[in-house]
């Protein structure tokens, strides 16, 4: 057993024995303190999606870093899609085109009480966007800095896009994601640096897409003592309940599919604010509800599953409506899915090999059910090999307890840097 362990350690050591790879690892270690400082600076700038000045400020901070690395940087103004904009950094070179994806914004707007980077201990820090995803942005920069210091970056063909509206995409969405889609043109590989499942033993090779739906119901009002009469009917609320339960009966349990009616209102009069996802309803106990509405989301792993779910929901609405009611169901597209592909699996295998060679252990694909929506999904039809969730790890993102595991900053950076180097040199 001991002999096998010694042999294993020898193999791990020898697998990164090539001088360029050793130099990359050493350079990442040397730059870790600077990376931590950059992370703290970025987190201390509020960049809630709707704080345009803050998003631009984080973009300026990172832009200087890319400029110093020899990238040609561009700020894409977001006025056309009602957002701050995006940072694009391009480094033409030889070898395969590789796209790296990050985002500058967070869910924490200026009115949030959660505003500052706080070091908890040597291993952990808390702060708004520290893992989602300023930590991932810093992993990108630290990996490129390590490659530059080791003399390996100059020949690389890399483009980086850091969007300014990942947490709340601009409108129209097509315009908001055009810079990302354009950057993906000709790319053979793409890496997204979201925090993923928060566990460095996993990365993302598939993501479910998101869309929204709205069910609006009209009924015949009248005195409650007359409800269920054929000429009065059941009212809007009963029809809303019938349809929602039909969705549950027909679709619940289908693999990778979820649907959630998140906001329900019913009564004599409704006031719905769809932007802020809230509203008011008024009615009396002795009056039959005339109007009802339900708003929710739908998550699917493929275009085919999305269409199947929508068709099923439409059929439920159309079948046997309750007397004197009518319902209307509408859909709105959101983030597309990132389906699992052979190319994604092969890229993960290379990332896994780099991790093992560094002594960090294996990396497996996380279930798409545990992976939310992200920007890489918009390029799933263009780039054959995509992985995501390889940024800084931690827990409680999108909450005032968002916490980073700082011990994963150098390890995630080394994994990314070694993978980029090997992809450029040719898969081992």
Give the ranges of each region predicted by the language model.
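Extracytoplasmic/secreted envelope proteins and their assembly/folding machinery
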Residues: 36-40, 59, 63, 141, ...
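Acidic/histidine-rich catalytic neighborhood of metal-dependent amide-processing enzymes
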Residues: 133-208, 266-276, 428
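Short, flexible, mixed-charge acidic loops at enzyme active sites
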Residues: 109-120, 206-211, 274-279
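Acidic/His- and Gly-rich active-site-bordering loop/insert found
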Residues: 19-129, 148-154
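Metal-dependent amide/peptide-bond hydrolase catalytic core
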Residues: 17-23, 47-48, 195-196, 205, ...
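Positively charged n-region of N-terminal signal peptides that target proteins for export
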Residues: 1-4, 155-156
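Sec-dependent N-terminal signal peptides
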Residues: 4-12
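Alpha-helical metal-binding/catalytic segments enriched in His/Glu/Asp
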Residues: 100, 121-171, 211-217, 226-251, ...
């Amino acid at each position: 057993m001991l002999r096998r362990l010694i042999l294993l350690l020898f193999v791990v050591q020898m697998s990164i024995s090539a001088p360029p790879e050793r130099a990359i690892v050493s350079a990442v270690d040397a730059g870790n303190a600077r990376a931590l400082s950059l992370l703290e600076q970025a987190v201390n700038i509020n960049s809630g999606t709707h704080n345009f000045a803050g998003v631009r400020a984080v973009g300026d901070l990172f832009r200087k870093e890319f400029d110093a690395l020899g990238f040609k940087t561009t700020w894409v103004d977001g006025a056309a899609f009602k957002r701050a904009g995006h940072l694009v950094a391009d480094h033409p070179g030889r070898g395969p085109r590789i796209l790296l994806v990050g985002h500058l914004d967070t869910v924490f707007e200026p009115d949030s009480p959660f505003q500052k980077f706080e070091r908890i201990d040597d291993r952990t820090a808390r702060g708004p966007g520290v893992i989602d995803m300023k930590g991932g942005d810093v992993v990108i920069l630290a990996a490129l800095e390590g490659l530059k210091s080791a003399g390996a970056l100059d020949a690389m063909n890399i483009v980086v896009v850091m969007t300014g509206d990942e947490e709340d995409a601009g409108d129209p969405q097509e315009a908001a994601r055009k810079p990302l889609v354009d950057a993906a043109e000709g790319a053979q590989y793409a890496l997204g640096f979201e925090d993923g499942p928060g566990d460095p033993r996993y990365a993302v090779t598939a993501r479910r897409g998101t869309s929204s739906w709205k069910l609006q119901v009209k009924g015949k009002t009248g005195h409650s003592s007359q409800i269920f009469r054929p000429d009065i009917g059941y009212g809007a609320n009963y029809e809303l309940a019938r349809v929602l339960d039909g969705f549950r009966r027909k679709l619940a349990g289908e693999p990778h599919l979820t649907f959630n009616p998140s906001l329900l209102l019913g009564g004599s009069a409704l006031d719905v604010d769809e932007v802020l996802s809230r509203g008011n309803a008024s009615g009396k106990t002795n009056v039959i509800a005339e109007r009802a509405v339900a708003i929710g989301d739908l998550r699917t792993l493929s275009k085919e599953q999305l269409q199947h779910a929508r068709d099923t929901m439409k059929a439920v609405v159309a079948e046997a409506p309750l007397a004197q009611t009518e319902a209307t169901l509408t859909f709105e597209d959101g983030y597309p899915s990132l389906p699992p592909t052979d190319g994604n699996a092969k890229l993960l295998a290379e990332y896994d090999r780099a991790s093992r060679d560094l002594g960090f252990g294996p990396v497996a694909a996380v279930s798409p059910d545990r992976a939310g929506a992200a920007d890489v999904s918009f390029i799933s039809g263009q780039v054959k090999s995509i992985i995501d969730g390889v940024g800084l790890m931690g827990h409680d993102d999108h909450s005032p307890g968002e916490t980073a595991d700082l011990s994963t900053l150098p390890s995630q950076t080394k994994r990314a840097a070694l993978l980029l180097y090997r992809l450029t040199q040719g898969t081992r």
